[in-house]
C-alpha cells in the first residue's frame, strides 16, 4: 500500500493508447481491480478512445477501486489529466477568418447570432467564439466581486485573466447569420466587449471518447493541510469531445 502506482498505471494507459481505434472510436479499457492505488504524480489520459475503469466507487478499497492522491501538502497538482492540455491555443484569440459578432447581445441559451460577414464560413466548420475580458466588463462584475469586499489589488480579476472562449461547430449559415451546435451560456454584450469568431486551425489536437468510470478518488490529508494547499484539480478535463466521467465518487 505504500508504493507509488503512478508509473504502473500510466504504462498501462500508454500501452492501450497504441491500440487501433475501433468503429466506435474506442481503443480499449484500462481496468483497475479493486484495491488502493497510491498516485504521487499525475495520470495522463491523453489518447483518443482510452477509458480508465475501476471495479467500484465506494470508500473501502476491499470491494472498490480507490485512487489515493498523495503529497498534497508539498504541491498543488492534477491527479488526472483528461485530454490535451497543450491544445489550449484554440482559444488564444487568433485564427483564420476572424469576424466580429454584430448581434448587440447574444443571450445564454442562444444558438445563433449575426456576424459582419459570414462568407468564409460553412456548416461543419470548427470555430472559437471569443469574448475578451475588458475593463468595462470587469467593472460590471465588480472585478470578480472583490471591489465591494476589500481593496487588495492582487485579488481583483484582470483583463485577459478570464477571457470567455466557446468551442463550437457551425451547423448552419444563412446570410450573415451563423448557427452553432451548442448554446452560449454567458451573455455576449457589446456594451462591455466586442465578441468575435474565428476558425480553429488545429482541430486534430482535440481528444475524443476519453472516459473515467466506476472508481473512488481520495486524497492524503492532515490537520495542517485539511483546508489549504490542497490539490487544485482532481480530474482536469481539457480540449475534449464526446468524453465522460461517470460513476466516480470523491
Where are these regions (language model features)?
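Right-handed parallel beta-helix/beta-spiral solenoid domain characteristic of secreted/periplasmic
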Residues: 2-7, 51-110, 117, 179-195, ...
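N-terminal extracellular ligand-recognition/capping segment immediately after the signal peptide
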Residues: 3-51, 55-74, 119, 132-143, ...
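All-beta strand scaffolds that present successive hydrophobic residues in beta-strands
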Residues: 32, 51-55, 121-124, 211-212, ...
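A structural signal for beta-strand register positions
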Residues: 36, 56-58, 128, 216, ...
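Ser/Thr/Pro- and often Gln-rich low-complexity regulatory segments
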Residues: 96-99, 105, 118-121, 139-140, ...
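A short, structured loop/turn motif at beta-sheet edges
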Residues: 118-121, 171-177, 206-209
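Extended Gly/Ser/Thr-rich low-complexity repeat segments
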Residues: 121-135, 186-210
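Right-handed parallel beta-helix
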Residues: 133-167, 171-177, 213-250
